[in-house]
Amino acid sequence: MAEASRNDDTLADPIGMEVFCNRLLSITEDMNNTLVRASFSTNIKERKDCSVALFDAAGRLVAQGTQIPLHLGSLNGAMQAILERHAVETIEDGDIFICNDPYLANGSHLPDINIVTPVFWEGRLRFFAANIAHHADVGGPVPGSIAGGLNSIFAEGIRIPVTRLARAGKVDDDLLNLICANTRDPEERLLDLRVQMATNRRGAAAMQGLIRQMGLDAVLRSVDDVIRYTRRRLLNRIADLKQGSYTFHSDLDDDGLGGDPVRLQVTLTVHPERLHFDFTGSGRQARGAMNLPVNALRASVYYAVKALLDPDIAPNAGLFEPIDIYAPLGTITNPEHPAAVGARSITAQKVAGAIFGAFRGLLPPEKIMASGNDCCPAIVFSGKWATRPGQFVYLETLGGGAGARYDSDGMDAIHVHMTNTSNLPVEALENEYPLLMDEYAMIADSGGAGRTRGGLAIAKQIRALVPGIVFSARSDSHTVGVATGVDGGLDGRRARLVRNPRTPNEEELFSKTANIVLDADESVRIETPGGGGYGRPAQRAPERLRRDLLDGKISEGAARDVYGVVVDSVRSS
C-alpha cells in the first residue's frame, strides 16, 4: 500500500497507482519469462543473465524487471545514448536499436547487448521496450570476452555503437550477420538476438494493450505518479538518516595484470534531501579489464541505496533523482577510453560492498551485515562443437558466502549484490558440453566465524573430456580483498583457482588467467570466497554450533580451535 507523503506531494489515487505499478511489473515479468524461455544459450536460458525494462518517450525508466541490478545502468545508458543520437521525430514505428559499447553507447561491458524498441500509439512515440542479455561470447582473443588481463576495449570483442538494427519493421540482416560473424558461435548469437527482438515486441504489445484498456491520458498520468511516488518515498527514507559524511573502502587484489592492490573508496554524504557518493580516493585506472564504466558505477550505487534503505521501492527514474555520484575521470570507477572493462562485475561488487560499509555509520546494528564474497568469479570453457560448425563457449559466474547478519548467518553459496544469476545445473552442463563435473560442493569452514557465521563458499571442479578445451577465469579475493567480519567476527576464507588439483601436476593459477589449453582428463577447480562473520565466535549459540557440525558446515577442529568449545559436549547438547 502506498504510504503517505511528508509534504503536499500527494497522489490523487494511491491505491490505483499501486495497482498500476504492479501492472507495469507484470509486463516486465512476462518479457523476462519470454527472454529466458525462448533463448538458446545456457547463459540466458539456464542462468537468466538478462534484464528487461520499460521507458517513456523522454527516456525515463518506468519499470524494470527484478533480475540483474547491474544491468540497470546499461539499460539507462543505452536509452540516453539513443535519444542523444536520434531525435524523437526521426524514430519510426518498427525501428529497433542495438548497442553494447561502454564509451560509444553508455554500456557496461561488451557481452551485454542492449536491444531497444519504440512503442507507438496512434502514430506517436509513447514508450520504449528494452532488454539486455549477456551473450556468452562477442569475440576477442579470449573465449567469453570477459578476461581480466586484457588491456584495451579494442581487445574485448565487437563494439556496437547505437545502431538501427531495423527500420520501419525491416530487420537489417546484413548488419545482424556482421555482428554475429565476429563471435565464436554465430548461430547461437543470431538466435538469441532474434529472441531479444521478439521479447520487445511482446512488451510493446502489452503496453499498447494497457493504453487501449485505460486510455492514453490515464496511462501517462499514472506513469508520472509512479515516478513521483518513488522519489518521495526515497526522500522520506533519506530524512530518517543522520546528516554527515561516512567513508569506507574495499580492495581488489590487483588491477587485472598483477601488481599492487587497488583501493575502491567511497565517501557517502547525507544532505537534507540528497545522498552524495564521492569515489575520490579510489585507485587509478587499471591496466587490465577491472575498470568500472560510469553507468555500471551508477547501477552499483542505485542498487545499494535501494537494498539498504527501501528494498520494496519500485526501481524507476524517481529512484535516481535524489542521488548524486562523482568519480574522478581516469580512475578505476570512471575510466578513460580505451580502457578495458570486461571484468567490471568484480569491481562493481567491491564498490557495492564499500557502499554497504559506508552505511554502517548510519544504520543500527540489526540492519548492517558483514562483507560478503563481493567478487563474482567467472569461469569460461571453450572448444569445438561435436555436432555442428563453430565453437561452444560455456560461461558461468559463481556465488560464494554472503556476509553474516546481526541475528542470522550469511546465506551459503549465493550470488551477492549486483549479479543475481542462477547456477548452471550439472545436468545441463554435461548434456551441452564435453565436460564432466567432478565436484560441486560448499566448503566447510569457509564462512567467517562469529556469533553469526558468514556464508559458505563454493567449490566447483570441472574435467575436460576431450583435448583442446580452452579455459579462462577471472576472480578476486585471493590475497587482500577478503570478506571482512564486523564487531569481532572473523574474515571469510580466500578464493583459489587450481589446475589438476590433488595430483602430482597440481598448479595454483593466477586469479585472472586466460587461454589455458586443457588436455583430455585435465581438470580445473575454483573455490570462491566465504562471507565474513558478525560478533565474537565465543558468543555463538551452542545449538547453532551443533547444527553446523551435523551439517558439515564447520569441522571439529574449527569448533575447538576457533569457537573454543568441546565437540562432544556440543554434539550431545
Model regions and ranges:
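Glycine/proline-enriched, intrinsically flexible loops and inter-domain linkers
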Residues: 2-93, 98-572
